[in-house]
Amino acid sequence: MLKGIHPALSPELLKTLAEMGHGDEIVLADAHFPAHSLHKNVIRADGISIDILLEAITPLFEFDAYVDAPLLMMKAVEGDSLDPNVETRYLNAIESAVGFTPNLTCLERFDFYTRAKQAYAVVVSGEIAKYGNIIIKKGVTPIL
């Protein structure tokens, strides 16, 4: 156990976050996401919602400042419903953890899957909200 590290962060997830370089992306996926068929580097965070993971990760994580939107979510498929509270919950978690909210954009479902395949890792959470997936892009960590 380390002091100052959120208990939702497993050793495997901490190691992954530390290994990521600027421009790398990590997917925080809901419990329904086809992580194992899309990616070889899958980390389990069963029972932990994505807003809790965002609260835990974002204080340790610099968002990419060189892109328009370092946050990406999946658009609802036409004719399907999307709970707008999911996006709000995620942005509130980030705001609470770091004091600001980076820009967010949404991708079509299969574009999101393509992007997820290129990510550094996929974290499968206990999130049960439909379309509850988010990709976060790491930026350059400032030198202390």
Curated annotation (Swiss-Prot):
Keyword Cytoplasm found: yes
A single GO molecular function term of this UniProt record: fucose binding
Residues holding substrate: 30, 109, 131-133
Active site: 22
Name of the gene encoding the protein in the UniProt record: fucU
Primary enzyme class: isomerase
Disulphide-bridged cysteine pairs: none
GO cellular component: cytoplasm
Protein name: L-fucose mutarotase
Any Pfam family hit: RbsD_FucU
Subunit (UniProt): Homodecamer.
Protein family (similarity comment): Belongs to the RbsD / FucU family. FucU mutarotase subfamily.
Role, per record: Involved in the anomeric conversion of L-fucose.
Residue ranges of coiled coil: none
Protein's organism: Haemophilus influenzae (strain ATCC 51907 / DSM 11121 / KW20 / Rd)
